């Protein structure tokens, strides 16, 4: 089967590290990088260090409003689908790249496979919520991280087939966890001891653009640190 996979941001590169290597054992995959995350630290480093296959097609689309960016991606992905003629288009998560890939495929009458389908924040002010809901309703095969996500899709009467396959990030952790534990270089450079720190990333606008919300997250991390470690 010929599969066109559309990725564009950091979390999607990480997930593709687990999925693409298995997909390519039995199918023909073409990887498209929209360019939503495009610098070395948010893009190239993952292809190098996680052995993600290099994208066969790079669209170089970044910046602009969510609407403008999605429209540019949609326009660029359309001819790619026509050229590759895939049997399915695979998308991850809830980004502008996700929606553009799903919509372009649906308009070309190509089945959409959505990894991490059925997740909901129930906050329609979030661009990601709109992206994930719309993509789910465009998809033929919805791969869910949990039974709760399957039930959510059933409650929305989606037309595609929803299947609970587990959390792809668990696969990533099992695949790359031993390698990360063996590499103590980053800890030495940061001056921290193994097991004596918490690492968290925050990037969603709803979490980082609101100072009060960001403070809540920091306070929660401090609470978890104190509760989980002997800090006396």
Residue positions per predicted region:
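N-terminal subdomain of nucleotide-sugar transferases
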Residues: 1-36
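A structural signal for isolated positions on well-ordered beta-strands in alpha/beta enzyme cores
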Residues: 2-4, 30-31, 113, 141, ...
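Active-site and donor-binding regions of nucleotide-sugar-utilizing enzymes
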Residues: 4-7, 13-19, 46, 58-157
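N-terminal beta-loop-helix "entrance" segment that forms/cooperates
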Residues: 37-53
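Central I-helix of cytochrome P450 enzymes
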Residues: 222-232
